[in-house]
């Protein structure tokens, strides 16, 4: 039996894609006969999760172990306890799967693997996107030359979520590692859990309307995901303002964790555009509530400046919702080719026009939604095959 260790800084929902992808991949690998353990910390933004530290927890056949982490510096998630566990126990595993970069957990895991001769896979999860690398560029450049260059040179493989993410990382890999030393690169699609394809619970739908009665009888324009700088929330605010002025039935529904204080900024932008009363902020929803929201929506919108995969896009399509996404979401080619939605430049006028087109043509919207479901179902099957390949790397 293959013994796999996955190392991720945190599984808190506020951190988006990796916190969803890691457990999903772990469960898939267990179903294929592997033994999977996940090392992570209890860090959750400025605070900490109340989790059982030092006591393994078994879920879906996966063993999770939580270690105390520091909340400062917030982005680094320093954890001496995690480092000690990696040093003393990593040799018991056949391969280690390391999530993200520029972060303590990844650095400690790669170092421990090299020290004990254990092969490891690096999974940047979008951190090599040129748009994101421009943020804190000097700090990241120093970290790359001091630490990440060695981490990548000694990796058994580098994993990407989409072919587009791999393409965007090629120049960086060749420069920082050297074209002769670049490890194997594989695309391992994240996929969507089966429950997203299930019909929405009527009770969850009723509960949502009871909590937010202003949604009754409206066409829901849905943003579903982290309220983050890269999500294009300024574009969304301007685009929705244009739509709302011409369509009194349009109502913006914003769902997801506010990790960077962008909820207040979005409120300000909507207030300045005089459409704040046509928006509802529903916060973080559980699985059933999320399916109820997406299942009853008119259109899903994600005008991101950068998106290495777009987990929320895939989940919306699994629920049969047509999507409007920017051409910087790495799923954009698949969405356009399948006719599952509209792909537009990352600017407000084009986004508004696409939203209006879908709201005006319900038959076309339903057809897009069905094509999206088929696209995601097919991608889920391919993701399973890719995960099996990742287990053999």
Predicted regions and their residues:
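Donor nucleotide-sugar binding/catalytic pocket of nucleotide-sugar-dependent glycosyltransferases
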Residues: 40, 144-206, 214-216, 282
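Glycosyltransferase donor-sugar binding loop
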Residues: 42-45, 192-193, 224, 251-265, ...
